[in-house]
């Protein structure tokens, strides 16, 4: 493996870590950084490049699982809930499952059709459409004078509604974080609470989707490229650790509009570059 391959793997892992959980669409950034600049498919072959992107996504997932390990242990029943979370209050595995259900079902039913509509223009329009949803979410949340709810206040009904918003992420470029955080704040959650629920829901659905993709493409896994895969995985893991912590600290202060404006600019850039 030459130096350039190490650099490409590290940069793509960096991009994955920066964008997978921020509401800005990792897909749109990968198009610009990889398809226009680094061209990993030319470097290692299209199938290996596809497998690599699955691997770096797993690095990001592992980072979030580590950050939320206490909550995950609680949901799995290995750690007791706080006393204040008794009598039906508190986030439960059932609520997470309800939130996962809509996107999981639609994803299984329409996976091939969603892949068939993947095109730079559809990604660009998804970025812009998602941006307007995020702006609307901040507007609605600001006008809601009721006390904003925390993640342990989420009801089954709210979990299902957020899960329905997550279905928008099946449109390539819309962003899972963008759609679900927007849904959460529209329903009266704080931005951080919506982000927490989003990241917790993302772990099982992304593990499932990545594992399924990896199994389907197992024959394409090139053992000689393990250092390439490992470099990207580690890069994505470490960057995701930092980005998610930073994002959760800031999101209640900066809200969604700054990300929305960035998405509009990125969407317009993609339309210009690929017009």
UniProtKB/Swiss-Prot annotation:
Protein origin, superkingdom: Bacteria
Main location: membrane
Record-linked InterPro entries: UppP
Transmembrane intervals: 48-68, 90-110, 117-137, 154-174, 195-215, 223-243, 254-274
E.C. number(s) listed in UniProt: 3.6.1.27
Membrane topology field: Multi-pass membrane protein
Keywords: Antibiotic resistance, Cell membrane, Cell shape, Cell wall biogenesis/degradation, Hydrolase, Membrane, Peptidoglycan synthesis, Transmembrane, Transmembrane helix
Record-linked HAMAP family: Undec_diphosphatase
Family according to the record: Belongs to the UppP family.
Protein name, as recorded: Undecaprenyl-diphosphatase 2
Organism: Shouchella clausii (strain KSM-K16)
Upper classification of the organism: Bacteria, Bacillati, Bacillota, Bacilli, Bacillales
